[in-house]
A protein has these predicted regions:
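N-terminal Rossmann-like NAD(P)+-binding domain of SDR-like oxidoreductases, especially those catalyzing
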Residues: 1-183
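Alpha-helical substrate-binding/gating segment
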Residues: 169, 195-196
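Substrate-binding strand-loop-helix patch
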Residues: 184-195
């Protein structure tokens, strides 16, 4: 059984669809926030549901609601958690920094804590290429992070990596972070450069 957070987002919906042959049960959660078109998010969910049928269950939940999160874990007994939930968008973080701290840091902390409590075997979480900051040595690799993010969004993602590392060390959780660069394709986010 797999939990996918941020399942109505571009990467989240595609991830759910790609899990069709791997898992018999996929639970997806998302806040359906209004950062960009909720209609687009619902269309993605409809596409996921059409592809996966009864294998997929959607729940509208915010990671900041730890009580609801715990109930989902109690009910579902997950083997793997794929965390793709986040307040996205580098530019938007300048206008609404509080949303980034609440969702990307506090929400991720709640998810980690619940994963620890329920002894989740594997956690895969989205990070971002923005954690590299102004790094000029190419090609980039995971060992080149200088901990000098130049935007708040990047700082929240770097914070997630640090919390994940601490939880991995303290509680023997297996956590992998994926530092996505610009991800694009059909059903992509309308605020991305390619769609403007």
């Amino acid at each position: 059984k797999i939990l996918v957070t941020g399942c109505a987002g571009f990467i989240g919906a595609e991830t759910c669809c790609s899990l069709e042959k791997i898992s018999s049960k996929i639970v997806g959660i998302d806040t359906l926030n209004k950062y960009y078109s909720v209609k687009l998010k619902k269309l993605r969910l409809k596409r996921v549901k059409n592809k996966l049928g009864k294998k997929f269950k959607f729940l509208q939940v915010n990671l900041n609601n730890k009580k609801k999160l715990r109930k989902i874990f109690l009910k579902s007994k997950f083997d793997v958690v794929i965390n793709l939930a986040a307040q996205a968008g580098v530019r938007y973080s300048l206008k609404n920094p509080k949303s980034y701290v609440e969702n990307n840091i506090n929400g991720f902390f709640n998810l980690l804590d619940v994963c620890k409590e329920f002894k989740i075997k594997q956690i895969i979480s989205a990070s971002s290429s923005s954690v590299y900051g102004e790094e000029k040595n190419f090609p980039l690799n995971e060992n080149i992070c200088k901990n000098k993010p130049i935007q708040l969004y990047a700082a929240t993602k770097l914070s997630n990596e640090a919390m994940g590392y601490a939880y991995s060390s303290l509680y023997n959780l297996r956590i992998v972070f994926l530092r996505f660069f610009t991800v694009y394709g059909p059903w992509g986010r309308p605020d991305m450069f390619l769609f403007k």
